[in-house]
């Protein structure tokens, strides 16, 4: 009877934890988990373990959290695990060539885009922001470059006009694990060939930045509507209203002309705000100290705040 493959898993956020769950339910042996060091989170800024670390500890899997894999000590620690394969999903650390060379079958990565489009840190949100018609998961063999390795397997899904960064994330987190298991099976059997990426088609998905979430009302409404969806649930698009922060969680396209940021109308259907081209109808908002509400609820209780002619974003936006 052949021994099960010895797999080292490396990942950090919830997207990665979904992949680890599938591997823990597989016939493979997960010998260790690598994840980012605990980070301060929440109002108290307490050190919090990553979702991957929490799952590993619940299943009695050894957890390693080196700040880097570039030094000889960290590489020797990995080599001592004698891995057949390393599976990497949204880990957040660069793997140098010396690490990629350690596992017998190499290292594979599950990336949340249809490579070579959207290499980099935020492929899900950038796909929604760009108005892409589809997204997916690519399982690739890792190289020293960022998301540049040969593609072993791809699965795709349409991006709907209602998709947010959150809804697309959740869908891809379901699609990725079966694709990884299929790729492992093919690699172990020696039946899977990699397809070289066409670098001329590559685009880069820059890391999300809170400053990007500040709404510039001079931009076309079609761009802002996609931005609102892409940045939900994080970092959430925002503006200001009479000097107060205003978070925008949902919006639709609307007709109307006016100065960028000018309130053109308000009803239970939403708050109509002029943009550089067309207008946005803001349908879900959050005011300071309150919870996110549909605009119909705000309109009933705070109608006076949304006077026609008021201009959003005139003062410095709160973070």
Curated annotation (Swiss-Prot):
Binding locations of (6S)-5,6,7,8-tetrahydrofolate: 113-116
Catalytic activity line of the entry: L-methionyl-tRNA(fMet) + (6R)-10-formyltetrahydrofolate = N-formyl-L-methionyl-tRNA(fMet) + (6S)-5,6,7,8-tetrahydrofolate + H(+)
Keywords: Protein biosynthesis, Transferase
Molecular functions per Gene Ontology: methionyl-tRNA formyltransferase activity
Keyword Transferase: yes
This enzyme's EC code(s): 2.1.2.9
Cited Gene3D superfamilies: Formyl transferase, C-terminal domain, Formyl transferase, N-terminal domain
Gene Ontology, cellular component aspect: cytosol
InterPro entries found in the cross-reference section: Fmt, Formyl_trans_C, Formyl_trans_C_sf, Formyl_transf_N, Formyl_transf_N_sf, Formyl_transferase-like_C_sf, GART_AS, Met-tRNA-FMT_C
Enzyme class of the recorded protein, top EC level: transferase
Matches recorded under CDD domains: FMT_core_Met-tRNA-FMT_N, Met_tRNA_FMT_C
Protein biosynthesis as UniProt keyword: yes
Function in brief: Attaches a formyl group to the free amino group of methionyl-tRNA(fMet). The formyl group appears to play a dual role in the initiator identity of N-formylmethionyl-tRNA by promoting its recognition by IF2 and preventing the misappropriation of this tRNA by the elongation apparatus.
PANTHER family the record matches: METHIONYL-TRNA FORMYLTRANSFERASE (PTHR11138), METHIONYL-TRNA FORMYLTRANSFERASE, MITOCHONDRIAL (PTHR11138:SF5)
Similarity-based family: Belongs to the Fmt family.
Protein's name in the database: Methionyl-tRNA formyltransferase
Protein source organism: Pseudomonas fluorescens (strain ATCC BAA-477 / NRRL B-23932 / Pf-5)
